[in-house]
């Protein structure tokens, strides 16, 4: 297994990959459509792209920005911009235009008492999506 940590816009290689992981990234990029287009070009046919990100809801604003940045101080203030959060449906549409189709969508929930993340059906704050390239 080879891992590459690079921006897809700057990644210059004549290879395509079986799997691309975009974990907690897309809510920070300047141009999500261009970023995902570049990622899709790096993915082989029948490849899988995983995207973990934050939904664009009032609840996500309260939990991911007010809670995580201001109250719990898990992250520096200003780490997230709510305007860059992305709804699953919007992500699905962007990737559909790049020949990737949603295969699975799950919510992710942090349990403060157990100090652990769990998969859930609630996608209103954090979620992870699996897309397949056609």
Predicted ranges, named:
Residues 115-134:
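Core SAM-dependent methyltransferase catalytic element
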Residues 56, 110-112:
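Residue-level marker for beta-strand->alpha-helix junctions and adjacent short loops that shape enzyme
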Residues 1-61, 88-91, 129-133:
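Conserved SAM-binding loop
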Residues 53, 70-90:
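Acceptor-substrate binding/catalytic loop of class I
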Residues 2-4, 103-106:
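General small-molecule cofactor/ligand-binding pocket signal
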Residues 13-15, 113-117:
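Short, solvent-exposed polar/charged micro-motifs at secondary-structure junctions
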Residues 82-105:
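Short alpha-helix
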Residues 60-70:
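Short, flexible, mixed-charge acidic loops at enzyme active sites
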